[in-house]
């Protein structure tokens, strides 16, 4: 385990960085992205899988009811930790929209940034190259 904003890895020493459902938990999203760029070799790739808010208004509403009401209730009953299941949708709501996140990636030093919607928009796969 370590701090994603202070990786114990040499500059330009990594070919690929992958993150699954973690960047929305970075204390400083920009710093975390810059740190990923720092450790990547020139031409290195970053692949990030992260939750997203669906764009379709009807599905967004249905998914919002599920994630904000049903998931915390059921998850809290099973785990006895409702707060963890309330945090999840709140953190997704606060995460930047795909266009904004890709702008942050470019600002951190990535090029050819792309987002591919998954599962009707509840997740995105972001890619970029150093």
Region locations from a protein language model:
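C-terminal lobe and adjacent flexible extensions of AdoMet/dcAdoMet transferase-like proteins
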Residues: 104-130
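A short glycine-rich, Lys/Arg-flanked "PGG" loop and its adjoining helix->strand segment in the class I
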Residues: 30-45
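Short conserved AdoMet
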Residues: 27, 41, 130
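A short hydrophobic/small-residue beta-strand
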Residues: 46-47, 112
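Alpha-helical transmembrane segments of multi-pass membrane transport proteins
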Residues: 3-5, 29, 48
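C-terminal alpha-helical "lid/dimerization" subdomain adjacent to the S-adenosyl-L-methionine
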Residues: 52-108, 114
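A short SAM/SAH-binding and catalytic strip from SAM-dependent methyltransferases
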Residues: 15-29, 52
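A short acidic, Gly/Pro-enriched loop at the edge of an enzyme's catalytic core
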Residues: 1-17
């Amino acid at each position: 385990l370590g701090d994603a904003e202070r990786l114990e890895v040499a500059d330009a020493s990594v070919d690929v960085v992958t993150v699954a459902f973690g960047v929305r938990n970075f204390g400083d999203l920009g710093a975390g992205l810059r740190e990923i760029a720092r450790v990547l070799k020139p031409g290195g790739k970053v692949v990030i899988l992260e939750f997203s808010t669906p764009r379709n208004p009807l599905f967004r509403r249905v998914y919002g009811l599920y994630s904000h009401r049903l998931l915390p209730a059921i998850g809290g009953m099973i785990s006895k930790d409702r707060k963890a299941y309330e945090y999840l949708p709140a953190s997704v709501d606060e995460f930047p929209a795909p266009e904004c996140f890709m702008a942050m990636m470019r600002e951190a030093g990535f090029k050819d940034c792309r987002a591919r919607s998954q599962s009707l928009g509840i997740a995105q796969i972001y890619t970029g190259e150093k």
